[in-house]
Amino acid sequence: MAIPNIRIPCRQLFIDGEWREPLKKNRLPIINPANEEIIGYIPAATEEDVDMAVKAARSALRRDDWGSTTGAQRAKYLRAIAAKVLEKKPELATLETIDNGKPWFEAASDIDDVVACFEYYADLAEALDSKKQTEVKLHLDSFKTHVLREPLGVVGLITPWNYPLLMTTWKVAPALAAGCAAILKPSELASITSLELGEICREVGLPPGALSILTGLGHEAGSPLVSHPDVDKIAFTGSGPTGVKIMTAAAQLVKPVTLELGGKSPIVVFDDIHNLDTAVEWTLFGCFWTNGQICSATSRLIIQETIAPQFLARLLEWTKNIKISDPLEEDCKLGPVISRGQYEKILKFISTAKDEGATILYGGDRPEHLKKGYYIQPTIITDVDTSMEIWKEEVFGPVLCVKTFKIEEEAIELANDTKFGLGAAILSKDLERCERFTKAFQSGIVWINCSQPCFWQPPWGGKKRSGFGRELGEWSLENYLNIKQVTQYVTPDEPWAFYKSPSKL
């Protein structure tokens, strides 16, 4: 597919089905991470804009054109959005690449997943109609009970910059499928395609207020959304410290939250792997895909001593072969990280690892052939101790740290030696061993003989400090539904006979 040359659309905030200028008229620069140039501006919402969006959402839930829709009717909107996204795939992939820095072919693949995700939740929305009211059998014949599954209400969706439109879809699609009215606050570092989703919703005729999109800074737009008394739920994907702030603010209103936070996931490699090159490639993919900016990245390689020298030698050869370039170039496999702040943070992690006694086996700096942009070489760090920062903390960049083990028990201990619990991988041909590790891993996701494949049908989420709640699959739809019990006394002519009846005069 040819990569189009396009201009950056100049959008406003998307509120109540219309483009509206922020009340304070503030805008933020869009910086292309590949060349550090300002390529446009996004609107910066503040508390007043949040309040307008919440009022629009409440109004949408009261109106018949959204609040009274069936699942089948909502499914038509979701399928129309999917079709429009597919139609605009080349443009959206290009916008995402110049906004986020990921290789264009990865961005294009993400857009395919966006389409599939909207279609999947369209199917689930239709299925909701037959599940909306479910009878519950009781032990007393004088009562009957059923359960209603209703939209939770107005939901705030706060999304990250590493998969801008895809992470948006992970939240928007199930929220709309459930019949909620959603307010999206994407990361200010990569908002372009989320704003384009607003234009797509306008084009397909999504009822006003069903989805509003507010770009801007976290403390100016995100915080007021979280603490707004008329927002019924918050779903957040992002950093642990921000997740703690969101959880604390939401707790003041006893507001439910879903949190998908950071990770420091292990990939455990045994000496009985099926194929050396296949195992090496999965190890690279698990850490360096999406420029290393993946919450579930298997960035801790835990490898059996007996295969470590051979494996690391081959890993080094493969790593040196990774094409680092402008992400719009053909065959680019590693682009820039998202921002100068992230670039400096990653280099500081690498520097600290070296100061603490680790060895930089490869990388650790800017590629020599790229003078501008936030590029960092894929980096492999060995001689790592479990007390080191590089072992403990999420880097969120193309940095792999390595530690060896002798026996299974040691590998499990190392794998679980983390405050996080999002993902974990094991590479071994011994499936009984893989099953033991599946049970022993303290994580929400386990990969066997692979790393990072992600599908929209199974659940996605972690444990420990990686958050709680699940996205994707039917589990995500449940996040946006309220379960209401309805019990009827079916023998109203018969007295309940709890109190003594007054004497008749």
From Swiss-Prot:
Provide the top EC class: oxidoreductase
Annotated active site residues, numbered on this chain, are 260 (proton acceptor), 295 (nucleophile)
Would I find Metal-binding among this entry's keywords? Answer: yes
A Pfam family cross-referenced in the UniProt record is Aldedh
| Residues flagged as site, Transition state stabilizer | 162
Top-level lineage group? Eukaryota
Catalytic activities: 4-aminobutanal + NAD(+) + H2O = 4-aminobutanoate + NADH + 2 H(+); 3-aminopropanal + NAD(+) + H2O = beta-alanine + NADH + 2 H(+); 4-(trimethylamino)butanal + NAD(+) + H2O = 4-(trimethylamino)butanoate + NADH + 2 H(+); 4-guanidinobutanal + NAD(+) + H2O = 4-guanidinobutanoate + NADH + 2 H(+)
GO MF term list: 3-aminopropanal dehydrogenase (NAD+) activity; 4-trimethylammoniobutyraldehyde dehydrogenase activity; aminobutyraldehyde dehydrogenase (NAD+) activity; betaine-aldehyde dehydrogenase (NAD+) activity; gamma-guanidinobutyraldehyde dehydrogenase (NAD+) activity; protein homodimerization activity; sodium ion binding
User: Which biological processes are named by the entry's GO terms?
Assistant: cellular detoxification of aldehyde; glycine betaine biosynthetic process from choline
Quote the record's binding site residues for NAD(+). Answer: 159-161, 185-188, 238-242, 261, 394, 460
Q: Is-annotated flag, keyword Oxidoreductase?
A: yes
List the protein's name.
Aminoaldehyde dehydrogenase 2
Gene responsible for this protein: AMADH2
